[in-house]
Amino acid sequence: MIMLVSCNSAKYLADEQSLIKGTKILFKSNTKINDKKSLEAELLTFIKDKPNEKLLFFIPKEWIYLRNSGLEDTLWYHNGLRALGQQPSIYKEEVVSKTVQEMENYLRLNKGYYEAKVDFIVEESNDLVGFKSSATNEVWEKITNKVTYIVAPGERYKVKSVAYRSDDQELLSFVESTKDAAFVKKGDYIDYTQFELEKGRMSLDLQNNGYANFSNNYIEIQGDSSRNDKDIDIVFEIKTPLPDTFHQKFVTGRINVYTDFIKEQTSDDLVLDSLQNINFYRQSTDFLVKPSLLSNSIFFREGTKLRREERLKTFKKLNSLGTYRFVTINSAPDAVHDSIMNFDILLTPFQKKWIFDGSLEGYFSTLGASRLFGVSLAGALQNRNLLGGSEKYSLRAELGTELGFNPGVSGISARTRNISIQNNLNIPSFQDFLGLGKLAWRTGLIKDKFYQSFVEDANTNIGLGFSSLNIINFYSLSSYNATFGFDYTSVKGNRYIFKPLGFNLDLYAISDSTRFVDNPLIFLSFKDNLGTGFVFRDFSYIYNSGKSRKGNSFLVINNFEVSGWEVYLTNQLYNVISGDNSQWSISRGNLLNRDISFAKYIRYEFDGRHYKDFSKTRSLASRLNLGIIVPFGENAASPFIRQFGVGGPNSLRAWNVKEAGPGGYRDPEVKLKEPQVIFVNQGDIKIEANIEYRFKILLILDGALFVDAGNVWALKEDPGRPNAAISGDFLNQIAVGAGYGLRLNFNFFNIRFDFGYKVRSPYKDPVLPSQWYTFKEIRQQGLGNVQVAVNYPF
């Protein structure tokens, strides 16, 4: 209690000063206010003096600031504590009055409430502030104020009519032809934001129709409210540049591309080549990037109408190639013909073609007296322009191990070892070797506009890799993969990843088969298998909303995966034609001399995240993660590597990786004298929810409070794992954990220490009366399950 006895701000303030305790907005209106919540959020931005925040929910931040602001408080830790605190939010009537005037002006000038009135009232109260403890009693009486802003908006004016005027008749004719897409129409409420959007729309349409020099500055908005009604006639007046009476339209002229531009270049040193009416100048003997690729990345041509969107697409595409450090597009009117715009495209390549990147990662977790420490070393070698077409080739290798430590039992020992090598080739163009994209477009599965954008901006990815995982004295897995697909990000920022072709060969070796002697379904999931996709392997759609004005943002990740469906259909067709009843597989006698079955399953996973920023130092993050995998054909179980698990530093943090579940089943191995740090509890269905409150503590130290809940279930009843299958009682099998975290925030990454406590068990214990842990049982968990990792869990 030593820190708390004097945490009183009042004794540092003058007698005439008082703290702001709260602010709110109260609407007074006889009629319904359109979009009231949005209007309130807009008005709240004008309130400058808000109540001070608290550190760790009970220590006033203004007290920390004032306590370390004396003349003698000049040491480094005083500066740090002042930065941690906040200047006191002192009530000032002149500030509140200014806020009232700003709100009133905003309602009248921006939102169409021309008769709006704003006032305020102050509610004073004598509050007892300070702290009382067994050691001391330091409580003061101090005046605090609650400020209520009373907003009487009155009736909102509407748009009676919309008209466009200009002396440039050709321009005016074009503008009127596009008015169906206008942001301001008859019957709309008066809104300055919508007016600005309409000006922007008009300017953009004109810039995409040859009017390269047009801008919003040429558009004036006039309104006629001479009548007594609440409707206004709106006129968009389009001025012409003096002394002209019209705006100049441009067509594209000469296009010069400098493929290896440096400032010291002179035209005498350059070699000229031409392709598709584009001049390519180079200083090097050979082209760094194929001119055909550069030509296809330039979306405007000589003699065509000048369009702003084509220049932006060109800039984006050339930058996305990854070969050039700087991309500059300069334009200038032709010296002879004033309606022609010439272009110089300056491309400055990176000096290094090969780059190397390395990383060292680690994590730490606990389970009772057991400790698990994981470390991995990774290195990546990348070529920015492998074949002269800006192809990005990367070779990534990773080596990792997990060390277990159980004091007094086994000491330190290696629990897992893993190694992986992955080759990737990214081609910055759409290479539809199989013709699937064109087929989907021609059959109407995708729209014309989307297909055209996909063809222009999609990248082609080819991958080939190997990984090996060895759970020592348990099982090992060797996996080989090969994929071919496309990666496309739309103008709105939505990402599409489509892999029509993909193969995964998974080879298992079980060291301890006795562990699965009573669990045949688990044993089947460890069968050697080949995952296949000849036309469709998997598809991912990632939606990112961006942050709204209220601090909300959403991230949604959808993944749909299918394996073996082409093999299954072909096998069934063969059986129908031949009258056979065979199930195709790769039998012994192959190069590996192993029986390999075709993996047949359908898998879907949803990961939805919501982030809410309350301020620069406080936010709330939440996640809902759902998944299901269904085997089909003769497969009784889906591959172990594609099943779902919960627990670990990025899931249920009170449990270790794959410790909880499935369902209400409890792994008998956890009852052994030596606690198991490596678990294999997985399922076909996953439900998980997480919520985390994040806040700043001091300098680079952040804090978090979190709750995690979820479990996995099997699709089918398993005699060897009672209560593992999904049922109507699944809610009673939800595991719940809670805890707190400390994060060292280094901007680009953070090191995370999470302390998770089991709050609710997913299974019923015959000894304990409830699945909920008592407060005493939670305290007995000590520091809880300690998880140390890098970056946020979601």
Regions from the PLM with identified roles:
Residues 171-174, 287-288, 307-556, 653-654, ...:
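Gram-negative/organellar outer-membrane beta-barrel architecture
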Residues 279, 361-370, 497-695, 705-728:
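C-terminal outer-membrane beta-barrel translocator/porin domains of Gram-negative envelope proteins
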Residues 349-351, 562, 615, 744-748:
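A generic beta-sheet turn/junction motif
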Residues 356-360, 393-397, 462-464, 556-560, ...:
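Membrane-embedded beta-strand positions of outer-membrane beta-barrel proteins
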Residues 687-695, 703, 709, 734-746, ...:
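Conserved C-terminal beta-signal and adjacent last beta-strands/turns
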Residues 4-6:
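C-terminal motif of bacterial Sec signal peptides marking the signal peptidase cleavage site
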Residues 8-364, 375, 397-398, 403, ...:
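Periplasmic polypeptide-binding modules associated with outer-membrane biogenesis and secretion
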Residues 722-772, 781:
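C-terminal structured "cap/appendage" subdomains that terminate the fold
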